[in-house]
């Protein structure tokens, strides 16, 4: 009886240790890889922000990434109610753009935030972009967040579109 209990406890501890190591490796991989995740199929983009987010801003961001070799299935400029009402759900094959409320962000300095879901076996699954209310007009902000939704991470080089500080980013892009 005690032997079975000890083996069960040892198996549980081993599983928890394995999961922890796996998570640590994924975090390290994301931290040290410029584009850790790829879309297997081109995503569609849905404007869940609403009519205040002009198609011009979305098109500018999409065009930027398409010129860099990314593929987008299509852009839906009108909110799709069945998808957009699920603010905290990341939908498969979709990049949704939302108006972010102050509570969404961890700091008053954060203007945009992208939550993405990826799998080691399938790559990028989906992403939600949150732009702080009224800040979508800030140069390159939506393009930067769309970069995260497409699988890119930050680059700490002044002028790079993926620089983490808005004031230090520009419309330059290269793979470091």
Task: Write out the residue ranges for each language-model feature.
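Post-HEXXH active-site segment of zinc metalloproteases
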Residues: 152-175
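Intrinsic-disorder/low-complexity coil detector
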Residues: 35, 41-42, 78, 163, ...
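Disordered inhibitory propeptide/activation segment of secreted metzincin zinc metalloprotease zymogens
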Residues: 9-53, 62, 66-67, 103-122
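Metzincin-family zinc-dependent endopeptidase catalytic domain
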Residues: 55-145, 149, 153
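Bacterial N-terminal signal peptides that target proteins for export
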Residues: 1-9
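Loop/turn elements at helix/coil->beta-strand transitions in domains of secreted/extracellular proteins
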Residues: 42, 70-72, 158
């Amino acid at each position: 009886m005690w032997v079975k209990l000890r083996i069960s406890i040892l198996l549980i501890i081993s599983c928890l240790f394995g999961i922890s190591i796996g998570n640590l490796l994924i975090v390290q991989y994301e931290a040290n890889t410029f584009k850790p995740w790829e879309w297997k199929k081109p995503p569609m983009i849905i404007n869940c922000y609403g009519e205040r987010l002009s198609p011009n801003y979305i098109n500018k961001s999409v065009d930027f990434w398409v010129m860099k070799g990314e593929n987008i299935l299509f852009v839906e400029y009108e909110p799709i109610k069945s998808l957009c009402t699920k603010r905290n759900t990341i939908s498969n094959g979709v990049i949704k753009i939302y108006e972010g409320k102050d509570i969404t962000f961890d700091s008053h300095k954060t203007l945009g935030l992208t939550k993405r879901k990826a799998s080691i076996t399938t790559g990028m699954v989906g992403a939600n972009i949150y732009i702080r209310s009224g800040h979508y007009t800030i140069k390159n902000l939506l393009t930067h967040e769309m970069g995260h939704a497409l699988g890119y991470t930050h680059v700490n080089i002044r002028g790079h579109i993926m620089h983490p500080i808005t004031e230090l980013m520009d419309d330059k892009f290269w793979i470091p």
